[in-house]
Amino acid sequence: MAFDECIENPAPYKYVKDSCDRTYRWLVRCKKEMERLNSLDDTINKNQMLFGINQGGTFDDIRIEHMQRIAELDLPGYAIGGLAVGESHEEMYHILMLYFLMHL
């Protein structure tokens, strides 16, 4: 998995948005570095996979935008981050359903 910023919950909208932007930049850097390392002859395991981590707190619009951005990187897998960190069960299940519906 790529680096991501684990923010507190709840967090202000702007901070969550900025954090997602930062996490996306880290993911792009991780992908480039992994591609560089896998191009080397002496790389031991070229089959490692890089997963992107979807963040966005409990803000639907940020989560959707962040997932769309990281999906464009065409990674082998994705994870849902920033859940079960203090939000209500209702909020957690809402985010899981949002994620699930985006991928039907």
Predicted features along the sequence, with ranges:
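Non-catalytic, usually N-terminal nucleic-acid engagement modules in DNA/RNA processing proteins
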Residues: 1-43
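Glycine-rich phosphate/ribose-binding loops and adjacent secondary-structure elements
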Residues: 33, 37-41, 45-104
